[in-house]
C-alpha cells in the first residue's frame, strides 16, 4: 500500500519545501496543493536549472505524477495561466499533468485592488502581504460570496449575477473608503470568459481522485505553502496568512480525512527567516540595501540567498528557535523533520540556538499573537561552529563533528527525529536518513 505524506513548513515559510517535494515525488503518484494561493514561491533546482512555482504543485516536473490543486487553494486564473505558459515553453506538458478542484475560490482583479488599497492605507502598520488578493479572496469564501472555479466553468447568467453582487460591495469599499478607482464589471467578465477556455478542461473532482488513488494503493504527497507560524489560527496574528498552513488544513483543503495521512514531514531551516512585518525574537538585524547591521545576519542572508521567490523581498534572518519549533512539532503532529540549508552555517565560529524565553507573560501563555511575541527575550545556548564545507554532502557520516552535534542537539530540543538533511539547492544535495514513504 502506498503512503500518504504531508510536507509543510514549520517556521515563517521559505524553508525549502519545493525542493523536498520535488525530491520525494519519485515515489508519489500524485502531488496536491491544499491551501494558500500564488503568494507561495517554491524553488526547484534540477541539474542546475532553476524553476520557481507559485501555484502549480512541485511534482509537475516529474513524468507520471498527477498534480492537483485542492479546494482549499484560492486560485488566480491569471497567475495560473501565466505559470502554465512558462512551463509549457520549457517543454513541460502541464495540461496533461495538472487538474483543479471546481470548489477553489477565484482571485479576481477586485481582490487584488482591495488587498493593495488596504496595505497602502495601513501605512507603517502594514502587515506585509504580497498584495496579490489572497486575503480578500478568503474573506469572500467565508462570507459565502466567492466566485468559484465551478461558477467560472458554468458561465452564463449565474456567473454574471455573482460577479455583480461581489463587485457592488468591493467597489463601494474601494471608492468610498479607500478612495481608489472601481473595478469594472465588464472587464472582469471578459477575463472570466477568456480564462474559461483554458481552465475548463482541467477541472475534476479532486477529492474523488484522491480517494480512488488511496483505494488503489497509490502514494500521495500533500504540499503545503507558507509555514506553520503564518497559520491564521496558530501564527503570529495578525501577521499571518489567511489559511490554515498547519497539518489540519490538509483534510479541509483536499477532502482527504486525517486518518488517511500516514506521515507528516516538517521542513525546517537550520536557522530562522521571516519576510515582511511581524515579531521575530531571534532576529539578527541586517539591511541589505545599505549593507548595515549584524554581521551574522548578513552572512545568513547573503550565503543563504534570502530573498523571496514570489516578491524578491529581503528575508529577515536570525538564529534557530527551538522553542517555536517545539510548538510546530506538536500542532502538526510531525513524524519527522527535514533540516534545510545546513550548509549556510559553514564557516561560523559559533552558532546559537534559542532554547527558551525570559519573562514570558503567564497570563498570555499559549497565545500566538504578535503582542505576546514582541516582548520575548531569547535564552541562547551557544555551540561551536565548523570550518569545513557541508555543501553537497549526501551521507551523515560525512558531516563535520560540530555540524553533527548541532543536528543532534536540535533533535533533542524539539523532540522530533531529523529524517532528511538538505546541503544545497539541487535534488542530489540531500541526505535521506529515513524516507517518508518507507518510514
Swiss-Prot record:
Transmembrane segments: none annotated. Its main location: cytoplasm. Its EC number is 6.3.4.4. It comes from the Bacteria. The active site is at residues 14, 42. Its cofactor is Mg(2+). It is found in: Cytoplasm. Keywords: Cytoplasm, GTP-binding, Ligase, Magnesium, Metal-binding, Nucleotide-binding, Purine biosynthesis. Plays an important role in the de novo pathway of purine nucleotide biosynthesis. Catalyzes the first committed step in the biosynthesis of AMP from IMP. HAMAP family: Adenylosucc_synth (MF_00011). This is Adenylosuccinate synthetase. It comes from Acinetobacter baylyi (strain ATCC 33305 / BD413 / ADP1). The gene is purA.
